[in-house]
Amino acid sequence: MITTAETYHVPVLLKESVDGLDIQPDGIYVDVTFGGGGHSKEILSRLGKKGHLYSFDQDADAEKNIVDDDRFTFVRSNFRYISQWMRYYEVEKIDGLLGDLGVSSHHFDDETRGFSFRFDAPLDMRMNKRAGQTAADILNNYSEEQLADVFYLYGELKNARRIAKAICDCRRQHEITTTGQLAEAVEPLMRSEREKKDMAKLYQALRIEVNHEMDALRDMLKGATDLLREGGRLSIITYHSLEDRIVKNVMKAGNAEGKVEQDFYGRISSPYRLVEKMITPTEDEQQRNPRSRSAKLRIAEKI
């Protein structure tokens, strides 16, 4: 499959998310989800000669979209390691951080990666093809209870236990290594009127577990909170309730759990103030890019 920066991933809420950073021409910014480079290019277009942008992506395929600009540094790494990498580049404080947490269209459309149930493909689902266990490893090695927990916690599937049992029954006959074999094992449990949505939730749960997405998000947001200077902006786009809850909690309370701390006078103590109400794509953007429909943009400023 031939992929260009334009087809790799169409940037969602492009203007709104970059506007939210309130770009300072000489500032230092981080795009933690480089992908096709759409958001990064927009940030660079607003930076002056002394500004700099660090962009993260753990997928080797994203390197094909690297920008040729002295003000740009590409970091091939999971964004959870932002603190370590900023230390490596001797960056003490940043002026803003942007994250588009959606899975790139490239991943859904690549038949070899196993991110979509539209194709019969190996069950991989790793964002970084060099690291960690695959979705097939999880399906064939996790206990029935572990699988049920993954499907319930990360897919919010009400029949998680029945799905886990069906998978374990199937793997006693043969290993589950392809998307087609997974579909064959669980299709009888998918509600006909919601089959696509339930399958999407199942795939979401597996992808989150494979890539440790929730832990990585918590680590990244903690690092961002430490790195942002006073007045620095956090601009994050989420696509499902699990990641949105974490982002909302961090912006409101300063921690992923949403535990509100108060000062001596009973005032809520948080490192952020909300800059905007939640922003969603316009009807026009949703029509142009249907994958933007569930996107939510939240913007906060370090105080």
PLM features: residue spans?
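S-adenosyl-L-methionine-dependent methyltransferase catalytic core, i.e., the SAM/SAH-binding region
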Residues: M1-I303
